[in-house]
Amino acid sequence: MDNLSEALEKLKLASTDSATDSVESCLDCLLKALVNNNTEASVKIQEMGILPLLPTLLNPQSSCTPKVANIIAEMAKNEFMRSPCVEAGLIPPLIQLLNSTDQEVLLQTGRALGNICYDSHSLQAQLINMGVIPTLVKLLGVHSHNTALTEMCLIAFGNLAELESSKEQFASTNIAEELVRLFQKQSEHEKKEMIFEVLAPLAENDVIKLQLVEAGLVECLLEVVGQTVDGEREEDIAQLKTASDLMVLLLLGDESMQKLFEGGKGSVFQRVLSWIPSHNHQLQLAGALAIANFARNDGNCIHMVDTGIVQKLLELLDRHVEEGNVTVQHAALSALRNLAIPVVNKSKMLSAGVADVVLKFLQSEMPPVQFKLLGTLRMLIDTQAEAADQLGTNGKLVERLVEWCEAKDHAGVMGESNRLLSALIRHSKSKEVVKTVIQGGGVKHLVTMATSEHMIMQNEALVALGLIAALDLVAAEKDFVGAHLVSVLHKLLSDERSAPEIKYNSMILICAVMGSEPLHKEVQSLAFIDVVSKLRAHENKTVSHQASLTEQRLTAQS
């Protein structure tokens, strides 16, 4: 360490004149000390006040520059040295050096900046604001044959791409082309992984998704899938997962998805379809997720159902009923749910037996699968009276729905169960379905649903309760009383925040339950007439008209 102190003193003197040779030998001594004991040497360099001298030594014309940048990179491996490096004003001269043509200068400068800003979002954001992204992308293009420089750029991109503020800057460069070109040249697993690590965060941006698709990334990914699908090695399995996951990510953008769909004629779309019958779980998963993404608009959904995709998904689900893979089940159900959204698809999918296959998963204890199963059935029966009737009289299904209506730990499952229960009644308008729901204990849940914070759910509940009251009031009477239906309706009508349709359907329901003696008594005891008469002046004509009718009914039966 004595040599180091001596070298540091010399460096202080030498840096004031421009005796390059003596500076070089001092720098060599510093580097040697850092290699031997980085922490101790770094402390010494800081204590001797050397950091403020370094900006002047970072001169693009000087032969010392790569060594100075290397020293900074070594010191900044220590967390405690990063702030002092920033305070000494090292970042601006280092950024200037990124315009150098000297590959060694570029490499050491990149290392220095990377180490100083390691793990600091605020410093990385500063680099982005100072315009390093376009500079680094240009470097990658010019020096793509230099492995060390390429790796330095990739590590920098990987760190910067995590920041949201970087995406816009990346999108304005030709990063997509550069990365795809680089990817095509790689044969080593590690190098491909490095590029994947940059691609994944970048591909979260919709503009960059499209650029990557246009640059030919999808073809590269399909090639990786082809090479690794039958591989047993760990790296093959990892690459297959990364490539297929990235493929699905690209489909999350509307423009990139439509470009790859190509009206259902696209070769990429066809390849993805072939993944569904594969024996590889990862590919089955990616294939089903890709279909779910392609099924984000009605045109695509209609085309896919017409070309027989439903059968492939049902066969896939059938393979996963026993000892099934939960992620595959979830993905295939997501795809079916999306495909069932257009009205013209519903009857075709019902005829293909979708409901029967979906019901095989009723026993699943996995909330994500339960959630998608419920959503798929709800989409299928929308406007389909016959199917709603068939499912609504299925005692096992209704029993399970009632059970899930109490799944307090899983709000999504609870909400979807309530909505499906209501939908079975609303779309079937069947006395048999109402009877099944009453016997299964579903009425109290529909009353609770009417108090939901989501207006759409409140409304669905009120319409279903109205149908129960109209179709079988006698059988429902006890449950209505037990669930305090009348006081719930009183609250909804008194609450100024209730939407017009909530007020309207609550009044319809009040009229419907008047035929029951105990419910009628409750209506009288709660002075409904006051609340209803106020609603005659409501700005919504439908509400004010219904208020008049309800008031007449209440007066006549009081």
Walk through the language-model features, giving the residues of each:
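Long amphipathic alpha-helical scaffold regions
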Residues: 54-55, 63, 75-76, 80-81, ...
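N-terminal "cap/leader" segments of large eukaryotic alpha-helical scaffolds
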Residues: 1-56, 73
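Alpha-helical scaffold repeats of the Armadillo/HEAT/TPR superfamily
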Residues: 2-6, 45-53, 86-94, 128-136, ...
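Recurring C-terminal helix/loop segment of individual leucine-rich repeat
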Residues: 43, 83, 122-125, 168, ...
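Short, solvent-exposed loop/edge segments of extracellular or virion-exposed proteins
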Residues: 11-15, 225-229, 317
